């Protein structure tokens, strides 16, 4: 069926908007941990500089949460463009468009959306442990926090962080920091202990949860440990 001139003009007028909006509908990275809405700092840091104890929100994290997208559409006004860790967010009158970019590529924009990297979960102070794991991806994060990703058979199992300044377990930092460096360099299997009272978001696009590190035990092949 032929298309008349009026219909064709209408289709051509809305096509750019449809293509622009297609960025919003792209599939998110499967299985990543999405920071909750209350972790977002609305105005972020100036020119890519997220404040201490925060980091830039990523494209995948924003795409993976309809709640985060709805929140940002609600709090942004006008023809506003914000930096993400690896892209940009077009808020306000743009309608909430998420665009891909390179890490740090949009930090010349005035405002970056950042997330607070520490959350009190409300869970009880219960010991959780994970056996036969090795420490990888050592990260010196904000506020002198030291983190590691613990893997088993090459797959991430849990992340854990220790800090000298914040959280309930700051007094254990010196000992745990030395242990982390030791097992990371040696590549030895351990049993790692965490408390899920405090959850962290130091790693971008993490496929594992990260909590407060409370202990490390070296696996002994001659015993039942690990």
UniProtKB/Swiss-Prot annotation:
What does the subunit comment say?
Answer: Pertussis toxin contains five different chains, S1-S5. They are organized into 2 functional subunits: A, composed of S1 (which is toxic) and B, containing S2, S3, S5, and two copies of S4 (B binds to the membrane receptors). Dimers of S2-S4 and S3-S4 are held together by S5.
Look up the domain of life of the source.
Bacteria
Enumerate the subcellular locations listed in this protein's record, separating them with semicolons: Secreted; Host cell membrane
Q: Which family does it belong to?
A: Belongs to the pertussis toxin S2/S3 subunits family.
The yes or no answer to whether the keyword Thylakoid is present is no
Q: Name the gene behind this protein.
A: ptxB
What's this protein's name? Pertussis toxin subunit 2
Organism annotation: Bordetella pertussis (strain Tohama I / ATCC BAA-589 / NCTC 13251)
SS bonds (residue pairs): 50-114, 147-161, 219-226
Any idea which UniProt keywords this protein has?
Disulfide bond, Host cell membrane, Host membrane, Membrane, Secreted, Signal, Toxin, Virulence, Whooping cough
Span of the secretion signal?
1-27
